[in-house]
């Protein structure tokens, strides 16, 4: 058992909320801060890629008794569905017979996780902007603006779960011997939508991860519980087939007719979706160390943001929590050792997953359409 600590988690995303549940179960006081409004009260932004939960993620949920609860809001996916340019559709089953992953809507999952964290006793503070953290004594500084007046919030321990552009990491970067790199991909993404049939069923096979591989660009689709699909168009920002060349309705419609002909009947709002939803960037970040003394630790994307082509971003963040929990069980109140062993264990794995994710774009966009692959 650990001596109860007053702990702040900065970031109410998936990793921050699951971490809050783990910490509460260990008897700590947990406050979660987020500069955004409560996701349960806001309209969807049109800038999200559906999530894939694999064994790594399920283990972390299983260990705390949440696996079955989360499976209720997911859809089992047991194969890739490959849509070739000539209209041919083929399937590639995952691994062993019966092996599968789960498709989850980020928004639906995040809302549920916040509910579960509140039920566990964590307190959430939304619309609260954290601008800085004192690494020496685990104090947060919040205020309306970066240049305005700040208020100090005192804690025993702070976790930065505030994503690729983490404010907690920003403070750590100013320390000597802190390594940090950031790389924006030349590929962006845009969300599109396949609505449900009138009777609420799915227009295409709901148990497939749908891929339209086209070389240096591709379309992907994953099913939602309401009968719809969230689709994501990944393509270069510039060049022959790129976002910069899809500037008007005619060009867009012609482009989809040429490269994605079988989507014509299933994406009725293509033009509206394409020009309404933002074109978003993909960024990879790496850093080390992830922790400072026994006071502050980074977790999830704040320590290792990766590109989504291996479907492991959330799973890697959840695995961070699994390893952190192992270290808490092993080392009790010795937070310095907990943090040191946590980062030592996770850093090589996070780097490996980042590289696999980058490489998997080539496999998904090109090789899945290769006859030898099929």
Stretches with model-predicted labels:
Residues 104-128:
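Helical element adjacent to the flavin cofactor pocket in flavoenzyme catalytic cores
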Residues 115, 119, 128-132, 137-282, ...:
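Conserved FAD-binding catalytic core of PHBH/FMO-like flavoproteins
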Residues 218, 282-286, 303-315:
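Glycine-rich phosphate/pyrophosphate-binding beta-alpha loops
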Residues 4-78, 83-85, 97, 101-108, ...:
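Glycine-rich FAD cofactor-binding loop and adjacent beta-loop-alpha segment at the N-terminus
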Residues 3-5, 326-374:
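C-terminal helical "tail/cap" subdomain of flavin- and related membrane-associated enzymes
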Residues 88-104, 234-238:
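Helix-loop-beta segment of a Rossmann-like dinucleotide-binding subdomain
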Residues 292-307:
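Short FAD-binding loop at a beta-strand-to-alpha-helix junction that anchors the flavin cofactor
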Residues 35, 163, 302:
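Active-site metal-binding loops of divalent metal-dependent hydrolases
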């Amino acid at each position: 058992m650990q001596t109860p600590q007053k702990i702040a988690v900065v970031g109410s995303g998936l990793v921050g909320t699951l971490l809050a549940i783990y910490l509460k179960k260990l008897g700590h006081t947990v406050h979660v801060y987020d500069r955004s409004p409560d996701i349960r009260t806001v309209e969807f932004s049109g800038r999200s890629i559906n999530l894939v939960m694999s064994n790594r993620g399920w283990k972390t949920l299983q260990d705390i008794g949440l696996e079955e609860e989360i499976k209720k809001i997911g859809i089992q996916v047991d194969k890739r569905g490959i849509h070739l340019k000539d209209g041919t559709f083929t399937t590639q089953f995952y691994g062993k017979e019966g092996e599968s992953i789960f498709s989850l809507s980020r928004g639906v999952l995040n809302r549920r996780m916040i509910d579960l964290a509140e039920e566990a006793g964590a307190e959430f503070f939304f619309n609260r902007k954290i601008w800085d953290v004192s690494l020496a004594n685990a104090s947060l500084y919040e205020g309306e603006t970066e240049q305005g007046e700040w208020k100090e919030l005192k804690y025993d321990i702070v976790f930065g779960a505030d994503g690729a552009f983490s404010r907690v990491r920003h403070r750590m970067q100013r320390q000597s011997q802190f390594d940090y790199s950031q790389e924006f991909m030349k590929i962006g993404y845009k969300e599109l939508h396949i609505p449900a049939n009138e009777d609420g069923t799915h227009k295409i096979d709901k148990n497939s991860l749908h891929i339209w591989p086209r070389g240096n660009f591709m379309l992907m689709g994953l099913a939602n519980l309401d009968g719809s699909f969230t689709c994501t168009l990944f393509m270069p920002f510039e060049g022959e087939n790129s976002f910069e060349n899809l500037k008007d309705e005619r060009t867009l419609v012609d482009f989809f007719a040429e490269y994605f002909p079988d989507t014509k009947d299933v994406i009725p709002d293509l033009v509206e979706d394409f020009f309404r939803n933002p074109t978003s960037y993909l960024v990879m970040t790496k850093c080390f160390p992830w922790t400072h003394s026994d006071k502050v630790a980074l977790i999830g994307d704040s320590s290792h943001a990766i590109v989504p082509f291996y479907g492991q971003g959330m799973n890697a963040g959840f695995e961070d929590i699994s390893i952190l929990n192992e270290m808490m069980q092993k080392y009790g109140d010795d937070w310095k050792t907990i943090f040191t062993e946590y980062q030592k264990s996770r850093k090589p794995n996070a780097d490996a997953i980042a590289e696999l994710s980058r490489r998997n774009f080539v496999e998904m966009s090109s090789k899945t359409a290769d006859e030898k692959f099929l």
